Amino acid sequence: MNKALPADPADLVHGPLLRWAREHPDWPAIIQDAHGSHARQLDFGQLLAAVKERGAAPTGRPLGNNVLLTSTADPLALLIDFQAVIRTGRCAAVADPDWPTEVHARMEAALRDMGDQSPAPSPPPTPETPFYIGFTSGSTGLPKGFRRHHRSWAETFRITLETFGPVAGGRVLAPGRMS
């Protein structure tokens, strides 16, 4: 039997988090208000097992190999759910919580139609596996989706580090929502 080799973690979006968890477990990884997570907590082993078992993330709705995540009042929970989904080889679509019910329903239907409906678990992610579906604002009508694969973002991260050097590894302020 010919098994595919696992992907090089450096070619996956969550690869740097895995490395930091191993090399610098006590580094602050995510800080939100008075709450935070250290790098070691970004392993998500138990959460991943639960996600695989249920086929969805805690705040997500499974739609084939896509999972529609809705922004919650807790951005830290959304980031954890996002990481859990992409590590299972699925694609996380982040919905805008301000979408009207009918827009949300249309996005769910579109994601369901484009996803693999197989009940089998998704294979482990590869660099070419789609991991993220984002949406335009919808200012001209219905929001339009765009999909990114792991390699596209991993390459962006690599170029950022190459261009900006050590300062690219510093703290980042992300004041907006993921959607």
Task: List each model region and its residues.
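Glycine-rich helix-loop-beta junction characteristic of Rossmann-like nucleotide cofactor-binding loops
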Residues: 56-63, 162-167
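Conserved pre-ATP/AMP-binding loop-to-beta segment of ANL
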Residues: 6-14, 21-29, 118-135, 165-172
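Conserved AMP-binding/adenylate-forming core of the ANL superfamily
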Residues: 5-9, 13-18, 24-60, 103-104, ...
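Short beta-strand->loop structural element characteristic of the AMP-binding/adenylate-forming
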Residues: 30, 48, 67-111, 145-147
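Conserved helix-loop-beta element of the AMP-binding
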Residues: 64, 153, 171-173
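Conserved AMP-binding A3 loop
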Residues: 43-44, 123, 131-158, 162
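Conserved AMP-binding loop of ANL adenylate-forming enzymes
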Residues: 70-73, 164-179
